[in-house]
Amino acid sequence: MSAKSENKQSVKALEELLKHLTVCDAAEEADAAKALASFVNGPIEEQDAPSQVFSAISKQLNDKNATARERVLKGLEAVANHGSVAADVEPYLVELLPAVIAKVADKQNAVRDAAIAASKAIVRCTTPYAVKAIVPSVLESIHTTGKWNEKMNSLQLLDVLVEVAPSQLSYSLPQIIPVVSESMWDTKAEVKKQSKETMTKVCTLIANADIDRFIPELINCIAHPEEVPETIHSLGATTFVTEVQAPTLSIMVPLLARGLNERSTPIKRKTAVIIDNMSKLVEDPQVVAPFLPKLLPGLYHIKDTIGDPECRSVVQRAITTLERVGNVVDGKIPEVSTAANPEVCLETLKAVLGEIKVPTNEEVIAKYVANIAAQLVEEKDNENESWVLNITPYLTAFIDEAHIHKIVEQLRTRSIAKIPGGASHAEEEEEGEDLCNCEFSLAYGAKILLNRTRLRLKRGRRYGLCGPNGSGKSTLMRAIVNGQVEGFPTHLRTVYVEHDIDESEADTPSVDFILQDPAVPIKDRDEIVKALKENSFTDELINMPIGSLSGGWKMKLALTRAMFKNPDILLLDEPTNHLDVVNVAWLENFLVNQKDVSSIIVSHDSGFLDHVVQAIIHYERFKLRKYLGNMSEFVKKVPSAKSYYELGASEMEFKFPEPGFLEGVKTKQRAIIKVQHMSFQYPGTSKPQLNDISFQVSLSSRIAVIGPNGAGKSTLIKVLTGELLPTVGEIYQHENCRIAYVAQAAFTHLGHHPDKTPSEYIQWRFQSGEDLEAMDKASRVISEADEEAMKNKIFKIEGTQRKILGIHSRRKLKNSYEYECSFLVGENIGMKSERWVPMMSSDNAWLPRGELMETHAKMVAEVDRAEALKSGQFRPLVRKEIEEHCSLLGLDAELVSHSRIKGLSGGQKVKLVLAACTWLRPHVIVLDEPTNYLDRDSLGALSKGLKNFGGGVVLVTHSREFTEGLTEEVWAVNNGHMTPSGHNWVSGQGSGPRIQEKEEGDTFDAFGNKIEKAKKAKKLTGAELRKKKKERMARRKAGLEVSDDEL
């Protein structure tokens, strides 16, 4: 039988089935509809058969007979609900959707119900990538129809699309939200209710953690404009950190446009702040382009008319940011790209087809393919696999399969080429056995970290995981090991190696720590001991409680335990933290030799990554992008990531305040801290941790403290800063010297103030002029031994024996100071009736500093601190001053004054700690392992800031990269002894350039009160004195009154 005759038979069969559905009894209706659906979706020889039957269906939809209209709608529902809708049928169903939606307004209830069911069935059966073919007709119905029941159904169709095509529909939110917003003002109560429900559902597609909790308020503002000011206030206190995409702007811009039109100046200012903050997080100019006409005119108008200069400056900042992000030049808003328009994609498809002419009756399928291609372009999907999978089935309806692959490839490349800025990064191919190849999304709490990204790992490969602080590197590794990554193979053994070990196991010996782990299959103690010894553990370390191990040994222990679990993938989070150079080299060698175990490594040590990794997995706009090669190769491909590789490449730079003037210190070489023959031993230990150590620190010091793990570096620093007191030895510290100390546990203090803003925290911490967080230092707390020493010290003054009751003030005495003391006078000393009676304040006496330091050093230090307060070397504790100080360390003013500490990222908290520690303008900054808690950008900024700091710097670090070019002096600590090198210690002032005491501007006490200073009288020259004498003699000769002391 010929194809032509087969075609005639197919058409005739379809016509008979359709006719039977129209005239059959109600009992046969379901079977007739099912028969029609099976035939239409079955194999029909010539593809023009569906076009003819759907043409007949279209005519019958307008039949005068209500039963005929109802039956054909039910037939359409059956076709759409068929188990496998044919690819050449689907486009025709969508083509009929507007006509089906219109029938929802039919006067006959049965027809209306059939139309509702058919329209929903059609929307459900289509591919998710065809939303551009469906959404326009649905929105047109909502916008133009005067029939409330049709509008209700169209709103419900949007609800269906949220269920079946959520990610694809999110790209259409800028078109959907304005139309649904308009229907929320409908006069029909049912429509208003349905509109609000639909708006709530479509807003669930907005993947932005910053505004998630405000979405109900944003929706409420559409129906209740009077709520706009309060919502603006709520949003104004929000820190925006998540990348802003079109869905976010689609719900935010209507509110912001209204905010700009509010009468209140504070609301206009807050609106401009929100626009500025959100715009900074827009990466693609095409994302913001459609919204520029709604925001820029309002901002321009406010700038030209507002009277408040501060508000005007904020508005100008928002305009500058919007114009930069949107590529606005000379006020001209750029055109929105048409690359993702279905009409453009249809033209591209026809051009690609070339000589293969699209049959007139298959134009429907061609348009449908163009809509799918437009969606792929909208998503910037450049993966060939996606285009082949989503387009090929529909082209086979009218194109020979031999040509399809070439046509799809040409359509993809030409369509993607029209995207401004090009497509997203195409991942480089990697050889080897696949361990995993999965697509997933990841969130932390309400914050989205990764969105529909792909992770592909090969066996035996080493990957570096790179991204800024807060991007979710550690969260991803925890999600992998906890089985929370969708699609990740469950049979793979993944082990997360952390640098911290649970405190609950602090008393467990090292060997038992491995033995007691249920995930370790080997229970042979000798084998575990052998493995530990191979990793340099001694017998003492093997049996030592892990709480007594240094950080480096804990890391090696955790890694040894991990290998006993026979892992497929090792997840290492900052493995070089606390490791000295020797152990870092050991770790590099260890990882490189693991041929069957893959590794994912997070590290700030770029040199380590350069030696170890074979590929970099980089966080880019909520995606993971893989780049083959080590760290240096990665930087060549992504120059913007240069700060990961070179600290000096960081664009940020911290600026530390200039230290205050120190009385008697005339050069930067003079020692302001000096330690001689100091030893320290923790109570209960068998030997001292530090032995016979001497050093000095000056304003010009740039010191690196290095040494193996457990050598005593942190203990030395704690003695230096007063956290610990030496067991033996002398420590001199200039009376007014201030030290800023940032320990490894840098966030400890912040955890007690989660609900304060950074500004409020600094105001609380320095409310009395002193640092309240430093009140518990050992150098300030009076111990029982101190009390006993003070109690037993008797001074003989004016023939009486006295004990010091208090030390109140200080004054200059030659090259030192003397202190005013109040006393207890002794009566009947040495007898049973001995007692000590407080003396009157008139009996106070001044004692030299040298006499007091032996027993009353801590009381003397308190007076020194109080005198430093009176000297006016402290700034006013007001918001503006705090904002200016924090801005030097990379914290924005809005963040400092309007964000709570608990909402800050890890990097922002470190900057706050640095800002708080340096508030009192320290003379020495001491940092313990700064590379452990700062990302690469911040480390580069810190390095630059420390280079230019006017005081001394002491660093404890294993990172040679960080100290190179920064430090000149090295303290090598090993086995309790310290060997200095590169030092230039001097006695006295030294021979360096003299420090000139700067003429200070206004100075303030700790409470912000201005300190008035008496102006110094100018000393007259000899010529001026002689001239004055002549004038005085002339006045006396003239009989005028002249004062004897007049000059």
UniProtKB/Swiss-Prot annotation:
The keyword Cytoplasm applies. GO terms for molecular function: ATP binding; ATP hydrolysis activity; RNA binding; translation elongation factor activity. It comes from the Eukaryota. One of its GO terms (cellular component) is cytosol. Its main location: cytoplasm. The modification Phosphoserine is found at residues 714, 768, 783, 1043. It is found in: Cytoplasm, Cytosol. Belongs to the ABC transporter superfamily. ABCF family. EF3 subfamily. Ribosome-dependent ATPase that functions in cytoplasmic translation elongation. Required for the ATP-dependent release of deacylated tRNA from the ribosomal E-site during protein biosynthesis. Stimulates the eEF1A-dependent binding of aminoacyl-tRNA to the ribosomal A-site, which has reduced affinity for tRNA as long as the E-site is occupied. Assists translation termination by stimulating the release of nascent protein from the ribosome by release factors. This is Elongation factor 3. It comes from Schizosaccharomyces pombe (strain 972 / ATCC 24843) (Fission yeast).
